[in-house]
Amino acid sequence: MTKIAYLASKATLPGSPTRRSDAFEHDRMMSALRAPFAEHGMQVVDVDWKDGALDWSQFGAAIIGTTWDYWDHHDQFVDTLKRIEQATNLFNTADLVQWNSHKGYLRDLATKGARLIPTLWIDRVDRTDFLSAFERLDSNDLVFKRQVGAGADGQFRLGPMDALPDMPHPMMVQPFLSKIQEEGEYSFIFIDGAFCHALLKTAKSGDYRIQSTYGGTETAIAPPPQDLADAKAVLRTLDDTPLYARVDMLRGQDGRLLLMELELIEPYLYPIEGPGLGAMMADAVRRRIR
């Protein structure tokens, strides 16, 4: 069988003494991929992306999976991906990952017509920047996010009277949209450019973060045609088709969906809500490495 590396992190791999509370999502992905890939003569093997002893040439391809610590080791991560790419097929590509790893990619997409939530970009937030952000965005409820990060790590929801927390990293600032609590966040999963499935993610009562770590829940949905069209329009802004993509969106005041994130690095792809995910990925990888 052709071995396919599924890149993980130490804290998501089974048996880790410091395993993350959301590592069950890693297990679900592995369960979804193993059988469909085996039907095409491929064996999916989960590995630690930091394992310097691995010979990447033994794999027919490497898929970035639950590398959920890369933002704390960004340069090492990108360098490792470039080495992997020299030895085998890498999905998604190192260039795409490097571009997508900095939230500035959203500015690039906006120039190509993507509909975004209004955003400020601040390299180091001081008190002056903090206070002016509320005026510039005409909101008393803002969300501050790391420009390199994921999963609400280092994220703050603040008002103008709040104390300024330590934000040592470059930040992006957006108005908090009540729809995240009233309706939820939509995720659309695409494999090799084809729509696979969609879901609605909702936060637990009293919170706004929709990740499972914070008590968020997911429900599979059949998206209305206009919502799906809005998600597909985001993918069309890319020059190349990624193996996998998750488009995270929030409904704006006009009823249309706005892009929150285009996840092309290590997104959880929700195989429970999309039982056909594994087969679609196996077919796509087989075509690409043939």
Protein language model features and the residues they cover:
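Active-site nucleotide/adenylate-binding loops and adjacent lid/helix of ATP-dependent enzymes
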Residues: 2-8, 81-87, 94-183, 225-229, ...
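Conserved N-proximal alpha/beta basic substrate-recognition cap immediately N-terminal to
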Residues: 9-120
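Short secondary-structure junctions
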Residues: 42, 114-115, 138, 238-243
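A short, local hydrophobic-aromatic micro-motif
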Residues: 45, 117-118, 174, 245, ...
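Short, solvent-exposed loop/turn elements at beta->coil junctions and helix N-caps
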Residues: 49-53, 147, 175-179, 247-250
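Flexible, active-site-proximal loop/turn residues at the rims of small-molecule/cofactor binding pockets
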Residues: 68, 125, 268
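Phosphate-binding site of ATP-dependent enzymes
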Residues: 151-239, 258
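ATP-dependent carboxylate activation and anion-phosphoryl transfer catalytic cores
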Residues: 225-290
